[in-house]
Structure formats: C-alpha cells, structure tokens
Amino acid sequence: RAGARRESHRRPMKHNPIIVALDVPNATEALALVDRLHNSVGFYKVGLELFTAEGPPVVTELVSRGKQVFVDLKMYDIHETVKRAAARVAALGASLLTVHASPQVIRAAKEGAAGSQLKIIAVTVLTSFDQADLEDLGVTGRTVGEQVEWLAQRAIAAANRLPAGLHS
C-alpha cells in the first residue's frame, strides 16, 4: 500500500561497524545524540574534550545503556601511569582505548587491560599532521607515511613480545 513504512529499516543491525564520535562539549549533548540514534548505532567514541568535561561517568552511562565505548585519549605517559589509567578505563566497561604507538606505552596499556574486554589501539601519527609538523618534532628523513609505517611496525613488534594473555 502507498505510503506504508517498512519496519525492517528500523530494526537494529546485529553488527553495525559504525562508531559515532561524540565530539560535543558535555554529556547532555552526547546523550541527546545517543537518544536520537537509539538502536541504529551501538558504538560511540568519547574523546578528550568530552572525557575531560564529564569524566568517567559519561563512559559508564553509555555502557549502562548497552553501548560499546571507544575511549579516545591517546595516552602517552610513563609505564605505571598508563597501566593504571588503562585499568581504570577497563573497569568502566569501555571496549577500545587509544594509546601512543610506542612499545613501552602499548605494553603498559595491555598490562592494565589484562583480564578485561578492553582492546588497545596504537596511534602512530595524528591525521592532522603534515611533513612540517613531523619536522617540528625532530622527525627528519621520513615522510608522514614512512613515519606511520615505522611506528606501526614497532607497535606490532612490541605486541608480539608481550607475555601470553596480553595479546589482543
């Protein structure tokens, strides 16, 4: 019949690969977006701005609503600090956490996440960086692409050296 809506478009997908970035300044706006999207998306990214403004409660609220959470903080600090912070993010129920692609940072984050569902993503070079930015950091002799590849290879090598039980 004309004008009839097909309800099949409203059912949530069993696997939706989309992660929606909650790049908003506060939990009120973030949760309003989650409410508008309802069950069409089940995975959300909480970045530095929102996490700094609202803290861990924004992550636990999303998890309590049955959402998967990607905590995008790009951690880069000493071993024990990253290990403990990753453990705290894991305890919140988050699914993904970003850290710098240095072997020591990856190892620390994996130790902190051990025994949890938290997966670690290593960030090589920020997408906003260009050649001049790398040179400002003292990275010379490599293009942005080469730097990404070099850091990624180091991250993979570091992951391969992790003790059993810390791989994921």
Predicted regions, residues:
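Conserved anion-binding
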Residues: 14-15, 77, 81-168
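Conserved alpha/beta-domain cores
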Residues: 22-66, 79-82, 151-153
